[in-house]
Amino acid sequence: APENTNKLVQRDKVDVLVGTVHSGVVMGMLKIAKETNTLMIIPNAGLDAATGALCAPNIFRTSFSNWQPSYPMGKVLADRGIRNVVSLAWKYGAGEEAVAGFTEGFIKAGGKSVRGLWIPFPNAEFQALLTEIASIKPDAVFVFFAGAGAAKFVKDYAAAGLRKTIPLYGSGFLTDGILDAIQDSGQGLETTLHYADGLNSKRDKEFRAAYTKAFTSEPDVYAVQGYDAGLLLAAGLDAVKGDITKRKEMIAAMGKAKIDSPRGPWTMSKAHNPIQDIYLRKVVGKENRLVSIAHKALADPARGCKL
């Protein structure tokens, strides 16, 4: 990642970097962006440090920190009288940070204990861990998985019969983009994320109609984050009438931007991470349907950021 980013900046003389999906890759990009003072917008990677210890005036994010979607689920579970939880996640940055966010929210809201189980990334052989969960008998399980690994876990958890006795919860990435793959095994699953089906705002309806017309599929959270990256860049360019040499003014405008997003309006924190609503969703049919707002206007704590 550093080598390719360096080529884009030094050889191709790009004005703006936009990327990426994976937190590990974004680490390499951040290094070059900071060294060269190149404007950078992160449309997905949730690495806490990107708008924490590694924050910089020229670094912006339009998605989330790994802490952010998981923290409110802690209070949701504690408020339901759940006291002892087993957490399970891939043993890598995103998994560790998501579990830390959930644990912080859970204990703060009155939860008693979170016992952490881990599996190497991207391993998806869950049988031994499911057996261990059954023997521990917690009040609930909280997990962080995404993509194909998430789909397999949801199906394996249901097949093991655990959902009948031990409720399963997760960060929204557990079910986003994989509802076709998990089918009946995902029905009723509750997750927290910064986007949901059934928001029913005028803005979201317009976005969904335009997206399905262009791509013949329903938009997910990744589509919204990418769209908002475009809105943020446009806000900066509008403020300087397209003159990208006016870097200081452009960055200031992006920091003050109010993004009229399909997920709901949001603003930038001082560390340049979205201050946004986090929704509690439930899988109903082929939707991650809105249940309620789990946390209104949640800002990441931006630990270590000196901006």
Which residues does each PLM region occupy?
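Extracytosolic ligand-binding ectodomains
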Residues: A1-L307
